[in-house]
C-alpha cells in the first residue's frame, strides 16, 4: 500500500515507453532486473526527491566519479544530469529518467567492480584462464545498494579486499600522479667508471638505482653527486647480479648502461590487467594456502598472510601451458609411479612398437594388462589397441615424477611433483613441462605441508620416503587451497613493484579485453577439446594424471581459433636448453610432465 508521505514515480510507465529510445544502450539484463525491482517498490525512488537528487545520490555519484582510482573507467558510467528549473521542481518524467539511469549506471559499476568486464575469461581470452568473476546477482545487488546507509562505501566494498589489489591500486594512483620530473631519462654511452672516480653520469645512475646522496656534517664540504662512492658500488653489484651482467663488479660499463636503460616499469595497462585478475580470484584464499605464480616460476606456502615457504618451479611449455585456476590439495603421494598418458602411448610409443622397436626398454617403463606383466614382443601391435595396456614407470631415482607428488584433482589434470631434471631450475624462463608444475625441492614442500596438516616432523617424512611403501597416498586431514595464478606485477611488502614476463600472453589478452578490442585477441586452442588431427580424443590423463578419462565432451558445432606465436625469445630459450642438455634429460622433457 503506498505511503502518502513518500514520493512515487511512474517508473513502470517509463520502462514500457522509453526503453527502446533512451535506455537502449544500457545492459538488457540490468534493465529487466531494475524494472522488477522498482515494480516491487511501487515506483518509490532511491536517488531523487521532488526537488532533485538527494544525499544518497550525491554519495553514489561522488564515488562513481572516482572509478579510475579503482582500475575502472569513470567515463563508462553515464551519470544523468538533473537540472532544477528556474522556477519550481523538476517534472516527474525528468525525475523518473534520472532515477532509472542512475540506478543502471550504479548496477554497471557494481558488476564491473566484481570483474564483469571480462565475465568468461576461459572463453573470451584463453581456455587456460580457468577463472570466473565472483558476481553478485542483480536483485541482490539492488537490494544491498538501496539498503546501504552509505552508498559510496557500498560501492567501494565491491572491489577485491586482497592486500595485493590495494597495493596495485596505490601504485596506479601514484603512477597517474607522477610529475614530468619522473620521466624516464636514458643514460648515454660513456667510459668505464670505477669506484672513487667523479663523472656526471654517476648522479643519474644513483637516481636510477635509488641510492641516496650521503648526508654530510654541517661543517663538512657538500657531497659531490658525481662521486662514485661505496654505497652506489654495492647497488651496482646487486643490479648486475640480478640482471646476469658479467663480470659482477662495481665498474660502470656499457652493458650496465644498456640494462639500466631498459624501462621495465609497467605501464598503466599492465597494472590494470593485474588488478582485473584479482577481481576473478576467490574472495577467501584460505588461512593457509599454496600459490604458484606462473610468470614468476615460484611456488609459495602462505599462512596468515605471511610466506612460510618459497621454491622454484618449472611450468608448462607454450604449447602445453599450465592452466590458471584454484582447487583443493587433498593427497600427497610418496614414491609415486608414473602412468604414461594415452596421448604419449599413441603418438610417441605406438609408432615405434609397430616399427619393431621397443621404446619401453632403457626408459624404465613396464607394461601390464589386466594386472599381469606383458612383454612387448608378445603383442601384435598392428591388431591390438595400446590403450588397453597399462604402461607405467615404477618408483625409483629415474622416475619422471621423482619421489613425491601433490594432488589437487582438477579438470586439467595437472599437479605439483618432483623431477629428476634438476638442471632446469637454473634456467631463467622455466617453461618446459607438459602442463604440470615441477618443484625444485619437493621434500621441503612436503615437510611444510605435513607439518601444518598433521604436525609431522622431517624425520617422519624421511622415513616415509626411505622405507615406506610405494605409491603411498597420504590424505590430508584438511584440504589445502591451491591457487595457480598469472600475476605479472607484484608489490612487495617494502613497496617495491616487481614485474615478470608475459610468458603465455595472458596479460596482453586481458589488456585487449579491457579495452574492448576483442577482435585483436588471438586465442589458444581449447586444450580441453579433442585435438583436430590426433588419432584419439585427448583424455584426462594426457597431462600425466593416473585418474582415468573424464566424461565424454562434445565439440561445439562452430569452433575456430588462430594459433598464437609464442612470446619473443621463447623458441631461442627452448633451443638453447636442448643444446646444452643431456639426452636422458631431454627424454624427460618428452616423457615427463
Would you name each region that the model predicts?
Residues 1-28, 100, 104-108, 127-132, ...:
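Well-ordered beta-sheet/strand-loop patches within structured domains
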Residues 1-134:
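Cationic-aromatic interfacial patches
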Amino acid at each position: 500500500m503506498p505511503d502518502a508521505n513518500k514520493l512515487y514515480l511512474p517508473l513502470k510507465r517509463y520502462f514500457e515507453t522509453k526503453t527502446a529510445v533512451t535506455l537502449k544502450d544500457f545492459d538488457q539484463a540490468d534493465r529487466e532486473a531494475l524494472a522488477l525491482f522498482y515494480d516491487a517498490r511501487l515506483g518509490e525512488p532511491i536517488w531523487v526527491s521532488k526537488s532533485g537528487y538527494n544525499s544518497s545520490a550525491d554519495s553514489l555519484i561522488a564515488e562513481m566519479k572516482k572509478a579510475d582510482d579503482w582500475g575502472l573507467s569513470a567515463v563508462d558510467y553515464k551519470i544523468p544530469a538533473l537540472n532544477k528549473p528556474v522556477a519550481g521542481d523538476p517534472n516527474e518524467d525528468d525525475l523518473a529518467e534520472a532515477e532509472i539511469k542512475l540506478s543502471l549506471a550504479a548496477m554497471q559499476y557494481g558488476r564491473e567492480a566484481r570483474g564483469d568486464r571480462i565475465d568468461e575469461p576461459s572463453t573470451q581470452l584463453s581456455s587456460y584462464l580457468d577463472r570466473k568473476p565472483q558476481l553478485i546477482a542483480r536483485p541482490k545487488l539492488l537490494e544491498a545498494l538501496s539498503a546501504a546507509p552509505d552508498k559510496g562505501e557500498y560501492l567501494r566494498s565491491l572491489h577485491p579486499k586482497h592486500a595485493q589489489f590495494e597495493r596495485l591500486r596505490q601504485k596506479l594512483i601514484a603512477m597517474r600522479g607522477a610529475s614530468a620530473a619522473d620521466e624516464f631519462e636514458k643514460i648515454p654511452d660513456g667510459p668505464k667508471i670505477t669506484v672513487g672516480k667523479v663523472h656526471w653520469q654517476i648522479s643519474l645512475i644513483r637516481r636510477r638505482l635509488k641510492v641516496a646522496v650521503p648526508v654530510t656534517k654541517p661543517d663538512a664540504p657538500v657531497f659531490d653527486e658525481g662521486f662514485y662512492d661505496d654505497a652506489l658500488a654495492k647497488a651496482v653489484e646487486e643490479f648486475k647480479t640480478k640482471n646476469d651482467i658479467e663480470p659482477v663488479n662495481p665498474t660502470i660499463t656499457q652493458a650496465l648502461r644498456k640494462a639500466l636503460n631498459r624501462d621495465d616499469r609497467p605501464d598503466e595497462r599492465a597494472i590494470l590487467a593485474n588488478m582485473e585478475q584479482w577481481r576473478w580470484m576467490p574472495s577467501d584464499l584460505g588461512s593457509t594456502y599454496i600459490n604458484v605464480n606462473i610468470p614468476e616460476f615460484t611456488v609459495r606456502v602462505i599462512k596468515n598472510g605471511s610466506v612460510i615457504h618459497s621454491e622454484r618451479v618449472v611450468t608448462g611449455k607454450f604449447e602445453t601451458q599450465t592452466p590458471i585456476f584454484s582447487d583443493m590439495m587433498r593427497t600427497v603421494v610418496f614414491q609415486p609411479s608414473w602412468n604414461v598418458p594415452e596421448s604419449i602411448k599413441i603418438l610417441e610409443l605406438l609408432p615405434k612398437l609397430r616399427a619393431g622397436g621397443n621404446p619401453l626398454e632403457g626408459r624404465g617403463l613396464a607394461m601390464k594388462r589386466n594386472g599381469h606383466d606383458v612383454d612387448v614382443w608378445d603383442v601384435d601391435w598392428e591388431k591390438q589397441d595400446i590403450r588397453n595396456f597399462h604402461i607405467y614407470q615404477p618408483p625409483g631415482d629415474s622416475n619422471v615424477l621423482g619421489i613425491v607428488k601433490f594432488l589437487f584433482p582438477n579438470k586439467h589434470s595437472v599437479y605439483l611433483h618432483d623431477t629428476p631434471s634438476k638442471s632446469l631450475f637454473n634456467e631463467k624462463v622455466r617453461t618446459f613441462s607438459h602442463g604440470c608444475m615441477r618443484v625444485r625441492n619437493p621434500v621441503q614442500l612436503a615437510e611444510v605441508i605435513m607439518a601444518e596438516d598433521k604436525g609431522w616432523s622431517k624425520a617422519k617424512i624421511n622415513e616415509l620416503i626411505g622405507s615406506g611403501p610405494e605409491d603411498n597416498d597420504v590424505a590430508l586431514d584438511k584440504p589445502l587451497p591451491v591457487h595457480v595464478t598469472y600475476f605479472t606485477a607484484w608489490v612487495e611488502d617494502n613497496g617495491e613493484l616487481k614485474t615478470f614476463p608475459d610468458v603465455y600472453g595472458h596479460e596482453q589478452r586481458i589488456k585487449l579485453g579491457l579495452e574492448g578490442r576483442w577482435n585483436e585477441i588471438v586465442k589458444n586452442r581449447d586444450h580441453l577439446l579433442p585435438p583436430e588431427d590426433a588419432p584419439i580424443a585427448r583424455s584426462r590423463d594426457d597431462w600425466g594424471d593416473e585418474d582415468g578419462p573424464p566424461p565424454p565432451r562434445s565439440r561445439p558445432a562452430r569452433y575456430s581459433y588462430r594459433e598464437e606465436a609464442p612470446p619473443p625469445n621463447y623458441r631461442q630459450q627452448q633451443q638453447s636448453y636442448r643444446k646444452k642438455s643431456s639426452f636422458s634429460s631431454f627424454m624427460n622433457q618428452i616423457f615427463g610432465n
